[in-house]
Amino acid sequence: NKIKPGVAYSVITTENDTQTVFVDMPRLERRRANPKDVAAVILGGGEGTKLFPLTSRTATPAVPVGGCYRLIDIPMSNCINSAINKIFVLTQYNSAPLNRHIARTYFGNGVSFGDGFVEVLAATQTPGEAGKKWFQGTADAVRKFIWVFEDAKNKNIENIVVLSGDHLYRMDYMELVQNHIDRNADITLSCAPAEDSRASDFGLVKIDSRGRVVQFAEKPKGFDLKAMQVDTTLVGLSPQDAKKSPYIASMGVYVFKTDVLLKLLKWSYPTSNDFGSEIIPAAIDDYNVQAYIFKDYWEDIGTIKSFYNASLALTQEFPEFQFYDPKTPFYTSPRFLPPTKIDNCKIKDAIISHGCFLRDCSVEHSIVGERSRLDCGVELKDTFMMGADYYQTESEIASLLAEGKVPIGIGENTKIRKCIIDKNAKIGKNVSIINKDGVQEADRPEEGFYIRSGIIIILEKATIRDGTVI
């Protein structure tokens, strides 16, 4: 006795009040989500203004994180661990490092996708006035490649997961898709509880008792922000946590029925450029838009401050998030580097990546990226050092020092606090980078650094001369 949802059945009985009637309840079969029917779209084309200057030469998803990963590895690994093997990556600004990393990691001898694929869809211009414009927003980026989803090889894709390239979290996307199917949703937003202090940075939602989104506000301020407060005990938070996090924030992770997404972009809202501020608020009245509450660790690291804090939080003894998990590992480019060599160093609460050389130095509450060189007397504290893309030999280093030049890495007796050191930076001897005056914002590109929210950022390939004080 199998029935389908939405089909009514009736039972005819006799008029005899004393006769007992036995009815077998028909069995409702739950439709299982199949990853073969799902495609993922990772948005990697943003200008990255909030993460500037880290994005001055590279796209946001290619920014290093955790010592040896790139931000793109997070949604890519989540897709692989969720068995989603049809992945599109949309790129635009500074895309060369991102394209190179994806090719090294996920093509060729990297991760195997079986009958799936990873396709990089770079922003292009086409004939006609409209075709001469670059991506104008998240929705416009997907619209420009809508023909890809109408292609014959993608005809069986029923649901499309849209992902961002600047978040830190571990998630099974198929649980999200299963929730989407169970509720017969047209659109599902993955949401997380948000604290008062950061709520205005996100799109906020209000939901009814069935989880349907009834109101959506993109980054509201003032009275509009207060109006979006909800009782988050209704989504499973304890009274204490609900008091701290009285908002429900959209994570920027969406699931669309494929036909609904195509209809929204082509016919309903052909001039709308952004999912969060335009498409989704407009779709609430006409479509079944559901919220999926994600209660594990999630961090939007789209600003320098949040990127810095989330990165250094990884160094804690018991971090809220860690890249290591034997069941759901995070993948990155295989670099075939030797183990790190550490001579007579003091290291506390730190992450030291592959292929580093540390000599008689101190590292505390810091991340040291691959191929880093820390010389004698170096003190590194509250710092994320991204490392280098290549080695300099001992003879090359000696030759540079003899010529009064600065090799890649950190020279003798240099003190560094609260800093992000971008790739291939050259920091000399007896340098002090401590921001003694507590400057919050400064632009010194000609001197090789910026300051954002009190955090010093040493630029990629910058040279900081011996004895410099910042």
From Swiss-Prot:
It is found in: Plastid, Chloroplast; Plastid, Amyloplast. It comes from the Eukaryota. It catalyses: alpha-D-glucose 1-phosphate + ATP + H(+) = ADP-alpha-D-glucose + diphosphate. One of its GO terms (molecular function) is ATP binding. Prominently expressed in the leaves and a weaker expression is seen in the tubers. Activated by 3'phosphoglycerate, inhibited by orthophosphate. Allosteric regulation. CDD domains: ADP_Glucose_PP, LbH_G1P_AT_C. GO terms for cellular component: amyloplast; chloroplast. Its EC number is 2.7.7.27. Belongs to the bacterial/plant glucose-1-phosphate adenylyltransferase family. It comes from Solanum tuberosum. It holds the Pfam family LbH_GLGC. The gene is AGPS1. This protein plays a role in synthesis of starch. It catalyzes the synthesis of the activated glycosyl donor, ADP-glucose from Glc-1-P and ATP. Pathway: Glycan biosynthesis; starch biosynthesis. Heterotetramer. One of its GO terms (biological process) is glycogen biosynthetic process. This is Glucose-1-phosphate adenylyltransferase large subunit 1. Keywords: Allosteric enzyme, Amyloplast, ATP-binding, Chloroplast, Nucleotide-binding, Nucleotidyltransferase, Plastid, Starch biosynthesis, Transferase. The lineage of its organism: Eukaryota, Viridiplantae, Streptophyta, Embryophyta, Tracheophyta.
